């Protein structure tokens, strides 16, 4: 069963498409002088090559980035070590932890629920405008 799950999950992830707008927005942010760090908790529990698979997917889909960090079970620590000043995620739990550490946090969601120090945005064009307004 574990082998089946691993193979099916890998196939599904490999075929997934990026969210609308993410490729263009990350390129514009990079062109504006921002560093782009991809921080994922993905580990080898269900994938024996998490870094390689993530890198292949990002490159295949034209997503620009400066550094890819996999296996980041403590994203707050990683963000602090890298000096990240804006964090984007769709997982509320991650957003809450990061925002409590003082990092500007954007949650990609359609939810109308509000949380202290977490900015909800529903698409990457909104995110781009918001980040530009911070400078």
Task: Locate predicted features.
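Anion (oxyanion) recognition and catalysis
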Residues: 27-30, 59, 99
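Structural recognition of alpha->loop->beta junctions
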Residues: 55-68, 117-135
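Structural motif corresponding to alpha-helix initiation and N-cap regions
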Residues: 19, 23, 72-76, 92, ...
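Substrate-recognition "cap/lid" segment bordering the active-site pocket of phosphatases
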Residues: 43-86, 92-96
């Amino acid at each position: 069963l574990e082998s089946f799950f691993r193979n099916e999950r890998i196939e599904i992830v490999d075929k997934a498409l990026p969210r609308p707008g993410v490729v263009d927005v990350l390129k514009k942010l990079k062109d504006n002088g921002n560093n782009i760090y991809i921080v994922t908790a993905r580990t080898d529990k269900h994938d024996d090559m998490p870094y390689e698979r993530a890198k292949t997917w990002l490159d295949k889909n034209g997503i620009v980035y400066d550094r890819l960090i996999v296996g980041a079970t403590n994203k707050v620590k990683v963000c602090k070590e890298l000096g990240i000043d804006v964090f984007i995620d769709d997982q509320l739990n991650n957003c809450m932890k990061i925002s409590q550490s003082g990092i500007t946090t954007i949650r990609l969601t359609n939810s109308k629920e509000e949380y202290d120090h977490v900015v909800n945005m529903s698409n990457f064009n909104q995110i781009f405008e918001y980040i530009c307004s911070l400078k």
